[in-house]
């Protein structure tokens, strides 16, 4: 959020990462997408910032630059690269996902997380629906605590909830990091040159 970025600036950070609602992981509780959040950050901040959340191609890099960011953070996108130290099942899940395949969990706990839909996420959402705001972290502990090694290292895709951004809908391949960066920069340069 802008207020978190301003706090980072106030305590002396040299730069900030501004995360839109599209991001994988914890987007905060304000639900502000990058098309609003980035220009607001540009209005308020004196320090440079990078755009995070929903970033994965040259179009998005150009858009982020136009809205005042100095660059982009592509968390979910870099998971689907050859060098990413995760199981091939995780990479393939991202390639096969659409922008509609994420869910928000832990809202009643005010610790909202965007994750890829799977069996564990369905269980969490059912518990949230039945327990409402009486839910406690202990109620979903089995689906969220300590699950990353099973998913990321062993490829057990339904072992628990795992962070994934909406940008999954734009992930169509598993390039090397070098190929991905060169592609994003090339796309961005082409867009800027042709406008």
Across the structure, where does each feature detected by a protein language model lie?
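Short, ordered loop/turn segments at secondary-structure junctions
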Residues: 1, 21-22, 77
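Conserved alpha/beta-domain cores
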Residues: 3-11
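Conserved active-site-proximal phosphate/metal-binding subdomains
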Residues: 10, 28-50, 56-195
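Non-cysteine beta-strand/loop elements that form the S-adenosyl-L-methionine
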Residues: 14-20
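Glycine/charged-rich beta-loop-alpha catalytic/anionic-binding loops adjacent to active sites
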Residues: 20-23, 46-47
